[in-house]
From Swiss-Prot:
Protein name per Swiss-Prot or TrEMBL: Nucleoprotein
GO terms for cellular component: helical viral capsid; ribonucleoprotein complex; viral nucleocapsid
GO MF annotations in UniProt: RNA binding
Main location: virion
Described purpose of this protein according to its UniProt entry: Encapsidates the negative strand viral RNA, protecting it from nucleases. The encapsidated genomic RNA is termed the ribonucleoprotein (RNP) and serves as template for transcription and replication.
Lineage: superkingdom: Viruses
Annotated spans, Disordered: 1-26
Compartments where located: Virion
Disulfide pattern: none
Entry keywords, A to Z: Capsid protein, Helical capsid protein, Ribonucleoprotein, RNA-binding, Viral nucleoprotein, Virion
Length: 527
């Protein structure tokens, strides 16, 4: 199998779409990543796709069919790429890291076993793949000019693998540190931060590696943002979590001052503030940017076309219309479904029905979404809970022997963009989830559970009289009470209409439909 050489890097005439503020607009009419042109984003995607291809084919010694169909092969290939990327990134910043020590030690290779297959990685070969693919488009000696942009997009390619681990184990604690012996991990339970047990599934991303959390700070769940800011020191890294808090809770009165107070105080001072913020979030949702993640091996193939001579050609036009949150992601999912009809997937899971549900949750982050919404938008009527997947997570482990079993991804009937703003126009209990995290922004009928009603009972009205603990708690308590008073046992949410998935093409969206699916009060993590 050959891959066509990268297109010429000579300047070509391009069209740049802008909004009224002169900012470039990406697919779906959204503002493009700051400082990054559409041409540059396409170049980065191409470079990463080439890396995945060469790691799978040249280093792992796997086939093009493995690249397309074996979800786990792609995840492990992306793991190596993410590691070597952070190795070069740390070197460029004159820093030290555990991955740097691993790459720079005396051995030339390292090995791991994936479902009965021993894979040997040559470090210099891995470095070479990364450097060759990057320098197709970027000047290696000007790493500061491109590393930040590459880092963000690279993290989005790596998101699928990180989320697959999260779907296995719901976060319940914040990792404070890993001791030098690498055997002791210091953690603090979320309840130590004032987070109700029934809302720990809002901690999406909490167990991601620090480099992933930092790269995608504005896509982390609200609990993750709160605990990271609670522990943050007032340094260059804390700013990311301040910004993430301001975005996620931008609908909260005086959030700028609240963020400033939280940064300056220790976790023990912030417990009631955190609890009130999450109680409010249970009703209103939060504004972090939700993301759709694709299996990296399959995505590398989806960005190419295969000709009659078995040669892959990068499809620049398709890549330019691709994104991780809007119509571009659903367009790619439609293409994904067509490719998988001829090339069914494998995840080392025998039961195809369970495999396709795990894939869907990992791609769309729907392990925190209400089953009523999922039943309405897909061809699946019987969604399973985490307790139904014990055997499947055993066979998913890399150390487990190979398990035969192919499956096809879940078909969609309707779609809407994933949430990046409040999903409502209106501004407790035990460890079972008290409400869902809204992933899709399509219209819905929400239910208010008794557990949700009980949140914040320890304690938009008043202004903030002073920047102190008591004043902030009073403000949030009164704001929560005003929100509770505005809601009954159910309310209408959603900011856009659902669209027909079968009408979606690369050039137009599906037709809008008048529907408002109702929640049923159950999610993947429910008891």
């Amino acid at each position: 199998m050959e891959v066509d050489p990268a297109p010429s890097t000579a300047p070509k005439p391009t069209r740049k779409r802008v909004n009224n503020s002169g900012e470039e607009i990406g697919s779906g009419g959204k503002r493009a990543l700051t400082g990054l042109s559409l041409t540059q984003k396409v170049a980065i995607h191409h470079a990463i796709a080439l890396m995945v291809y060469h790691v799978v084919i040249d280093i792992f010694k796997c086939t093009i069919i493995d690249l397309i169909t074996d979800v786990n092969i792609g995840v492990y290939a992306m793991n190596q790429i993410w590691s070597i990327h952070n190795y070069f990134r740390t070197k460029n910043n004159s820093g030290r890291s555990s991955i740097g020590a691993k790459i720079d030690n005396a051995t030339d290779t390292y090995q791991f076993i994936l479902h009965g297959r021993t894979i040997t990685v040559n470090k210099e070969e891995l470095k070479g793949v990364y450097k060759r693919c990057i320098t197709t488009y970027f000047d290696w000696d000007k790493m500061n000019d491109w590393m930040g942009s590459v880092h963000t997009i690279m993290a989005l390619w790596n998101l699928f693998g990180s989320r697959l681990s999260e779907v296995r184990i719901m976060p319940s604690a914040n990792t404070i540190s890993v001791e030098k012996d690498n055997r002791t991990t210091v953690v603090k339970d979320f309840n130590q931060y004032g987070i109700p047990a029934g809302m720990r599934h809002f901690a999406t991303g909490a167990d991601f590696k620090p480099t992933m959390k930092s790269a995608l700070a504005q896509s982390m769940g609200p609990v993750t943002v709160l605990v990271q800011l609670s522990e943050a020191k007032d340094n260059q890294y804390a700013g990311k979590w301040v910004d993430a808090l301001k975005r996620a809770f931008s609908h909260i009165p005086h959030i700028d001052q609240i963020a400033k107070f939280m940064l300056a105080n220790k976790p023990a001072v912030l417990t009631k503030i955190n609890g009130y913020l999450m109680a409010i979030a249970g009703y209103t949702g939060t504004r972090e940017q939700k993301r759709i993640a694709f299996p990296p091996g399959t995505l590398a193939y989806l960005l190419h076309d295969l000709d009659k001579e078995n040669k892959l050609h990068f499809n620049e036009d398709r890549c330019s219309k691709f994104d991780f949150s809007g119509a571009g992601a659903f367009r790619m999912y439609s293409h994904f479904l067509k490719v998988c009809k001829k090339n069914p997937l494998r995840m080392n899971i025998a039961d195809p029905g369970k495999a396709r549900q795990l894939l869907f949750h990992t791609m769309f982050g729907t392990h925190v979404e209400d089953f009523g919404i999922l039943q309405s938008m897909t061809d699946v009527s019987d969604w399973l809970k985490r307790k139904d997947f014990e055997e499947e997570f055993k066979t998913l482990r890399a150390s487990h022997a190979r398990v035969e079993g192919n499956f096809y991804p879940i078909e969609m009937r309707y779609y809407s963009k994933v949430c990046s703003s409040l999903n409502t126009k209106m501004i407790g209990g035990g460890s079972a989830p008290v409400t869902n995290c809204q992933i899709f922004s399509g219209n819905r009928k929400r239910i208010v559970t008794e557990g949700l009603k009980s949140l914040g009972q320890q304690g938009v009205g008043a202004g903030l009289s002073a920047l102190d603990k008591d004043s902030i708690e009073k403000l949030l308590r009164e704001h929560l009470e005003s929100i509770k008073a505005a809601f009954g046992d159910s309310f209408e949410a959603g900011t856009v209409k659902w669209r027909k998935f079968d009408g979606l093409t690369w050039d137009k969206e599906g037709d809008e439909v008048e529907m408002r699916p109702g929640e049923v009060g159950e999610i993947y993590w429910s008891n």
